Amino acid sequence: SEKVTEGYLIAGKDKQSISIEAGIVSVIGKIERLNLDILDDLQFSTDNSNFDLVIKKLSFDEIVLSDFRLPKTSIRSIDSNEYLILDIDNKILRGTLSLPKTGEFYPEVDLDFINVNLSQDNSKSTFLNVFNNLDVKLKLKTKSLLLDSVNYGSWSFDLIPEGNAIHLENLEGIYGKWGLTETSEGLSRLSISRSRLGWKSELLTKVYSGSPEKAFKQIGIEPNFEMDTFEATLKVNWPSLPWELDYPSILGDVSIDAKGLLILEQTELQTQNNLLRLVNIFNITDSFEKVTNLDFRKLYKSGFSADSVKGRVDLFKEKIVFNTPLLFKSGSSEFAWKGEIERRESGALGELNLEMIMTLPLREYLPAYALLLGGPITAGVVYIAGKAFERNLDQLSSGSWAVKGTLEDPKTEFKGWFENKKK
C-alpha cells in the first residue's frame, strides 16, 4: 500500500481550520477522555517514516492512567531531530515531555511547575501507579515544585526503576536559602524501596547554605547562632515514604562542615527545639568558665565563636553518637567533643554523656586580675584548676571536661589537665 507522506487528522466533532503541508501529518482537535493504559497496546514509532508528525493543538478534557487524572490539558508538538517534544499545559503542570525518536536517548520531562496535592486521599495510589508501572528511565526537572500549593523550589533528577525500588539519581535542588547537591564522591540519590516490612527511604546527598541563619528561619527555627556557611553530608534512612518522614525514625550519619560560627549569648533559651539546646551546650563561655575560672569572654565578647566546625553525628534508635569528634577551631584553640546523647522514643534528646577536650594557649585566656583557682601567678608558676604550669604559657595545653545531665540542665565537671603533644 502507498505510504502516507502528508495530510492532517482532526480529532473530535468540532470544526477546525487546518491546511496540508508537504512532508507533514498534522493533528488538531479535541478529545473528551484519553486513557493512557491503552498506550501499552500501541506500537508507535516515527523511525524510518517519510513524514513528520506535528500536533498543532490537541485538547483533552481528561487524561487518565489508573487512579491518576490530569484535568483539562492542551498539547502541541515542537520540532526536534532527536525527540518528539510535546508541550503540555494544565493547572497541575506546565512544560515539555521529550520522547526520543531512537534508542540513543531516554525521555525527558522539563517543567515550569508541577503542583502535587499530597493531602488528597488518592495521593499514595498515584505514587503507586508510577512505582508499579514505570519501566523506563526518565530525566525530570522542574523550575517550581509545589507540594499542597507550597513552593519547594527547583529540582532535577534521573528517575530510574529497579525491581522493587525506584531511584532519584543525580538529585539536585534549590529551596530558598537551602541547596542540595552531590557529595564529595559525586553522589546524590534518594532511593524508595518496598519489601514485606513496608516502605523504606534512603538519602545520600549534601545539603548546603550560604546564608544559614535565613535558611533555618525558613524552616521555622529562630537560630541562637550566626554562621557564614553550612554543609552537611547525609547518609540516612527511615522506614516510610519520603513525605512521611518522622524525625525520631531517622537513622544513619550526618557529617558537618560549617564556617564562621558565633553562638550568641542568651540568658535563657525558651525554645524546646533539640537543635538549639544542643548548640547552647557548645557555648563554652558559660558553663566552662565557671569550672576553670578561665576568662573566655576576654576573647568571646559576643558569644562563643569558631572559625570552623567539623565532625560526624551518628544517629541510632536510642542515642546520637559523636564517634568522630565534633571539632570547633577558634584561632589557635581547639574544642573537641565526643560521646553520646540519649535519644528518646518521642525524638527528644535526654541524658548527656559527653567529653570535651580543650586545647589552647593559656595566656590568651588568663583573666585580667591574674587570680585563678588555686592561687595567683608567682615566680613564673601559674595555677589553673589546681595544676601548676611552669612552662611558657604561650604553648598549647589541653584540659578535659565531662558533660552530664540533660540539655535543659547540663552538669560540667573538670577532669584535669594533660600535656599536649602538638608542636
Regions found by a protein language model. Give the residues of each.
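Flexible beta-edge/linker motif
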Residues: 20-23, 27-28, 58, 98-113, ...
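Extracytoplasmic loops and strand-loop junctions of Gram-negative outer membrane beta-barrel proteins
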Residues: 215-219, 292-295, 383-384
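Short, structured interface segments
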Residues: 26-46, 108-126
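Gram-negative outer-membrane beta-barrel proteins
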Residues: 35-39, 115-119, 146, 179, ...
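Short proline/glycine-enriched turn/loop segments at secondary-structure junctions
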Residues: 244, 388-394
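Solvent-exposed beta-strand/coil patches in large extracellular/periplasmic or lumenal scaffold regions
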Residues: 1-9, 41-96, 121-207, 224-353, ...
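Short aromatic-acidic-glycine turn motif
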Residues: 346, 361-369
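Short hydrophobic membrane-inserting alpha-helices and related fusion/pore-forming segments
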Residues: 371-383
